[in-house]
């Protein structure tokens, strides 16, 4: 099944890390810029949206956030994008609160996304706690200071204001759960799947004719030449 999740790039390093984690678990994701309109995401056939932001403590600039919400697609907002989601839903943010050491984060393991996950911890110099009316959201990630994660009411939409980490099992579990349990994606993305897909696209573009492949000497063009040869021969 050729399903995919779209990762909206709001912070380069955070976006790359999340995309790498998803692909390592064999879930296909496509990275798009924050200027990508909701209708473009729908045309891709995406099953879900991940907003990949950093953790600066300021709400991220997400130009089409309301449009994304109106698609009805499942959405996972991470880092500063969760602060933006909170405000968009009518919530409020605390002033930055300095943190002394790691924050112990209590998770509601009964939530469909968290799926039995155990409590975790995060180190951030400061935190901004989110506040939403009970009718708007359910807290699912909290510390003694307040709410750091929520599930929006009547929507498959989640926000976590803390960062996901590269070598953290919780981060991988969260992303996989979003793709598998919420979006209904299958783990089909492998090296062979990439090769097969590229061969099909090249063969379709050539349409039974010939094709010219120009080599620059770089890795990308070399890979393209190999794929072209696999698809239509010499």
Predicted regions and their residues:
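Catalytic nucleophile loop
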Residues: 81-82, 221
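Short alpha-beta junction capping motif
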Residues: 61-81
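RNA-binding accessory domains that recognize and position tRNA/RNA substrates
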Residues: 1-51, 55-60, 69-71, 87-234
């Amino acid at each position: 099944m050729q399903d995919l999740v779209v990762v909206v790039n709001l912070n380069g390093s955070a976006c790359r890390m999340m995309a790498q984690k998803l692909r390592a678990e064999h879930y296909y994701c496509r990275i798009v810029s924050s200027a990508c309109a909701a209708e473009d995401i729908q045309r891709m056939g995406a099953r879900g949206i991940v907003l990949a932001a950093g953790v600066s403590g300021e709400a991220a600039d997400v130009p089409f956030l309301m449009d994304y919400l109106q698609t009805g697609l499942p959405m996972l907002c991470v880092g500063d994008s969760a602060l933006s989601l909170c405000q968009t839903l009518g919530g409020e943010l605390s002033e930055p609160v300095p943190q002394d050491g790691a924050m112990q984060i209590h998770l509601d393991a009964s939530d469909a996304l968290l799926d039995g996950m155990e409590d975790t911890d995060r180190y951030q110099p400061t935190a901004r706690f989110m506040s939403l009316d009970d009718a708007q959201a359910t807290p699912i990630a909290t510390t003694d200071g307040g709410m750091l994660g929520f599930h929006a009411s009547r929507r498959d939409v989640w926000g976590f204001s803390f960062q996901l980490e590269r070598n953290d099992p919780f981060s991988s579990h969260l992303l996989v759960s979003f793709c598998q349990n919420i979006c209904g994606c299958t783990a089909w993305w492998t090296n062979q799947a990439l090769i097969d897909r590229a061969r099909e696209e090249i063969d379709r573009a050539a349409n039974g004719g010939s094709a010219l492949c120009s080599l620059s000497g770089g890795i990308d063009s070399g890979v393209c030449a190999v794929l072209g040869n696999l698809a239509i021969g010499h």
